[in-house]
From Swiss-Prot:
UniProt-annotated binding residues for ATP: A58, V59, T60, G61, S62, G63, K64, T65
Family per similarity comment: Belongs to the DEAD box helicase family. DDX55/SPB4 subfamily.
Positions of short motif Q motif: 14-42
Protein's UniProt name: ATP-dependent rRNA helicase SPB4
Quaternary assembly: Component of pre-60S ribosomal complexes.
Cellular localization per UniProt: Nucleus, Nucleolus
Species per Swiss-Prot/TrEMBL record: Gibberella zeae (strain ATCC MYA-4620 / CBS 123657 / FGSC 9075 / NRRL 31084 / PH-1)
Highest taxon listed in the record's lineage: Eukaryota
Entry EC no(s): 3.6.4.13
Transmembrane regions listed in the UniProt entry: none
Xref: SUPFAM superfamilies: P-loop containing nucleoside triphosphate hydrolases
InterPro entries assigned to the protein according to its UniProt record, in alphabetical order: CTT_SPB4, DEAD/DEAH_box_helicase_dom, Helicase_ATP-bd, Helicase_C-like, P-loop_NTPase, RNA-helicase_DEAD-box_CS, RNA_helicase_DEAD_Q_motif, SPB4-like_CTE
Length: 637
């Protein structure tokens, strides 16, 4: 009787790791749906757990988060004793607050399976209750992001609960680490993780990153994780990794008998369609209607925040019935961003996230079926990150980028050279026409005419889009001189073209072929409409000119008395400062020793934050002064 051969164990099985994973970690990852390691986890964990620095480049949606959380957690929990009070053992730096929050969420889920850590976690939600003391190593995380808490609240949390793992965006981390009560000595600090490393090393984050590194010991484990690391190699060397292991996990597909490297998941279909600007949104609507399976989660990328603000009102005019639309961009208030992002994640009906490149990198958005880029991104590196929102973790996905006819079609070859091949979208067949474009333009303009506020949004959005287009890095492909401005006016439903440098030499119809009674074109918002009417009446009666003359005389008079007023103000400030110091002294005399220490800590942090704010304001003022010559001067009412 033939005996059955034992099943061959997968090289990506969790029990193949050496050193082996703790049993509770294996239980945790199993509940998260990871029956075995993803390729990036299988390649990274042995090295990072084996006390080596790593530089990891892997396709988006490949499980990078657990690839650094598991080694970090395992290393800290295998220490001989708990982390000392107010000492930090590990730091994870993320470029955005959303990504930092998601990493924190994954870590919290992981720690629910570790008994000592799980007992502490509920106490972290109560600011008035200190966490229980533990004699065995445990993970105590703290999330540091702007917009949800103040720096004073962050320091208070740190002093009360003594977290040993910080997950933060760069700016907020610098503020906390500037406190003399936050310690990262070589005896305690173990691991630094830079997630989305190439973005962290961009010019905008470089100063903050240097300050963070200056607080950390050189004897540490460092991991850099990103979807594209090669273009930031020079910066990575400066970070100070010690003989790092470079790990590159790419997907290889068979095409015509030839293995071809790709930077996106094989389950993702990468396509493009060539459409005039006026047909792009009708094409999007037809794509949503024609797909054989209705996408439950879709992401539509626009170039600017102002474009999102405008098209969130316009897209519902043309979307198929049953689709909800959620806007998200970086200029939303933190609470609005969080609310809209959670709304998109929790939606049970077909939903479209209308967004900018804020959602292109790092955000863990599961089960995205469709990604549409209305315009190609100005930075070619962002293209794969936008497209990679779909097709994550083996799920099938479709990504479509829309290109204008002509020179923009060279973008296809440009991407192929960068090992990101895209093919024409063949199924479903999208057959939009000039009639469809004209119908959409009329529908949009009719809608915009109902509220002058929409006209203002359209003008602002179009100007910002034109500037963004002119900032394309692939300047030989995306040239403002090649744009069909009249067609773009129809695409945006403009009532007239705005005044802007890009249209200086354009001789087309700046009124878009429309005759509009601008005097009676009203705002829906009553306050704004009242202000408009008052301004209109003043302009007609000539009061405005008189007002300007009177204002000039008044300012001149005020300037003459400025010195005297300034001296009086200095005296008032000095008196207020004396009163404040007297009150502070009285309050301090009534404090206990512990309260005095805490107050000193808060005062130190507040002083440091104020100093940094002054430096930041001065830098921004200098930058604004340099850019003043190219500033947009506005448009006609």
């Amino acid at each position: 009787m033939a005996t059955e051969k034992p099943k061959k164990r997968s090289p990506r099985a969790w029990d193949t790791l050496n050193p082996p994973l703790s049993e509770w970690i294996r239980d945790a990852v199993a509940t998260m749906g990871f029956d075995q390691m993803t390729p990036v986890q299988a390649a990274t964990l042995p090295h990072f757990m084996g006390n080596k620095d790593v530089v990891v480049e892997a396709v988006t949606g490949s499980g990078k988060t657990l690839a650094f959380l598991i080694p970090l957690v395992q290393k800290l929990l295998r220490l001989s004793e708990p982390t000392k009070k107010h000492h930090v053992a590990a730091i994870i730096v993320s470029p955005t607050r959303e990504l930092a929050a998601q990493i924190h969420t994954v870590l919290m889920k992981l720690l629910q399976f570790h008994e000592a850590s799980a007992e502490i976690l509920p106490h972290l939600k109560d600011d008035d209750e200190k966490r229980p003391f533990t004699t065995v190593p445990a993970i105590v995380p703290q999330l540091l992001v702007g917009g949800t808490t103040t720096t004073v609240q962050d320091l208070r949390f740190f002093l009360r609960h003594s977290p040993n793992v910080l997950i933060s965006s760069p700016g907020r981390l610098v503020e906390l680490m500037s406190s003399p009560h936050v310690h990262c000595p070589q005896s305690s600090f173990e691991v630094l993780v830079l997630d989305e490393a190439d973005r962290l090393l961009d010019l905008g984050f470089k100063p903050d990153l240097q300050k963070i590194l200056s607080h950390l010991p050189k004897q540490r484990r460092t991991g850099l994780f990103s979807a594209s690391v090669s273009e930031a190699v020079g910066e990575i060397i400066r970070v100070g990794l010690r003989n790092p292991v470079k790990i590159e996990v790419k997907v290889k597909i068979k095409g015509g008998g030839i293995l071809e490297d790709r930077k996106t998941p094989a389950s993702l279909q990468m396509t493009y369609m060539v459409k005039p600007a006026s047909q792009k949104l009708p094409a999007l609507a037809e794509l949503l209607r024609q797909l054989p399976v209705r996408p439950q989660r879709s992401i539509v990328f626009l170039s600017t925040c102002a474009a999102v603000d405008y098209f969130q009102h316009i897209l519902p005019l043309i979307l198929p019935e049953g689709f909800a639309l959620v806007p998200l961009h970086g200029k939303h208030a933190a609470k609005v961003r969080e609310k809209n992002f959670n709304k998109f994640l929790s939606s049970v009906s077909p939903t479209i996230l209308l967004t900018t490149d804020l959602a292109a990198r790092g955000l863990d958005i599961p089960q995205v079926d469709l990604v549409v880029q209305i315009d190609a991104p100005s930075d070619p590196k962002v293209f794969i990150h936008r497209s990679g929102r779909a097709g994550r973790a083996g799920r099938k996905g479709l990504a479509v980028v829309m290109l204008h006819p002509g020179r923009e079609e060279d973008y296809v070859q440009f991407l192929e050279i960068r090992k990101t091949p895209i093919a024409p979208l063949e199924k479903p067949t999208i057959t939009t026409s000039e009639d469809d474009a004209a119908e959409f333009a009329k529908k949009t303009r009719d809608f915009v005419l109902t509220d002058r506020g929409l006209f203002d949004k359209a003008q602002k959005a179009f100007v910002s889009w034109a500037r963004s287009y002119g900032a394309h890095q692939a300047t030989s492909i995306f040239r403002a001189a090649d744009l069909d401005w009249a067609d773009l006016g129809n695409a945006w439903g403009l009532l007239r073209m705005p005044r802007m440098p890009e249209l200086k030499g354009w001789t087309g119809d700046k009124m878009c072929g429309l005759e509009i009674d601008w005097d009676n074109y009203a705002y829906k918002e009553k306050t704004r409409e009242q202000q408009r009417k008052v301004a209109l009446e003043e302009e007609k009666s000539g009061v405005k000119k008189q007002d300007k003359s009177e204002e000039f005389k008044r300012k001149r008079k005020n300037n003459e008395a400025w010195s005297a007023k300034h001296e009086k103000e200095d005296d008032r400030v000095e008196r207020r400062e004396k009163r404040r110091k007297r009150r502070d002294a009285e309050a301090t005399s009534k404090m206990t020793d512990d309260e005095k220490v805490k107050q000193m800590e808060l005062n130190d942090l507040i002083a440091e934050v104020r100093r940094q704010n002054r430096e930041k304001a001065a830098a921004e003022a200098a930058a604004a002064k340099q850019e003043k010559d190219g500033e947009f001067k506005g448009f006609d009412d």
